[in-house]
Amino acid sequence: MVSSKEDERSLFVSGIVKNKDKYLFLVKNPEQWQQDENGRLRLPFGTVESRVAKGETAESALMREFKKEIGTEVKIVNSETSHFIYNGQVDEMNMNARNNKPLFVYKEEKIEEDRRRFDYIYSFLTDAGKFDDIRPLNRNAVVLMNRDLLKKAAKGKLSVGELKLRGGRIISEIELPEDALLYPTPSSKGLYLCGRCH
């Protein structure tokens, strides 16, 4: 039985980048690829995400991670509405902050070694400049997809090959297997769930 005394909380921020009709996501590096129950390779993808260090602001945490992962600067854009997502349920929430309002807060529960952990991911709309200037670092791959492709990927049904055939784009120095499925992390799934892509 997991007791409340053993609960842990971690705070993350993520940056949602959109240029014209496409969203930008990172495919995690090969060490984090996994196979599903049918032996098919799954490539986790999500927004640029960072754990917030003690004394750090959301914007500085995002700035640090964007420079590390894709070598670009980022600016938070205030969202008109904010959503709270937990267990697949989406609720609009009131945020008193005038600046740096997130598009959504995704609460994820994990149990590891009899310890319950809650991750809170604050996802912000951001401006990261032109996609032409973006280059993946740290063995990640950048994928660009429109909302229709994101809907399919959020359900775990989009392969790398189909992404290319249907107008998506991959920027990478590593080869992504054509038949591998793009698998959503909470930040990319949250973008789909909060209605931004409906």
Indicate where each model-derived feature is located.
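Nudix hydrolase/Nudix homology domain
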Residues: 39-43, 108, 112-198
